[in-house]
Amino acid sequence: TWAALREAPSLARRACEEGLRWNAPSPVIARTTARPCVLGGVALEAGEKVVMDLAAANRDPRRWTEPDVYDLTRDATGHVAFGTGIHGCVGQMMARMEATCLLTALARRVTSITPAGEPVPFINNWLRGYESLPAHVEVA
């Protein structure tokens, strides 16, 4: 997929969106019910906590063809990596712009990126990320 992005840096936005769908930085979110309601056939009272698994929604085979495959050409519109609605991440547009600019610049300047060691994820109940992600970068 890196070769495809190098050939077509204009795919950077799709690469960003597919990456967010495939491996959301915040895989779960929690909300509190404002009033009694029924969710998925379960009756909930006001004030109850509900945890939504965004990562599962982003890999739902009813919505995504081959959901466990990262596909640079996929239209990932509709993923919920940043939540949705009035509670969506306020910084999501900035994050998208930064990631798209970074991928575009890298695609123009870097011929390959390969692992240079084991990634070290940080442990957090609500976020995904890495303390260390060793990589060998070959500049064009």
Residue ranges and their predicted role:
Residues T1-A140:
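Cytochrome P450
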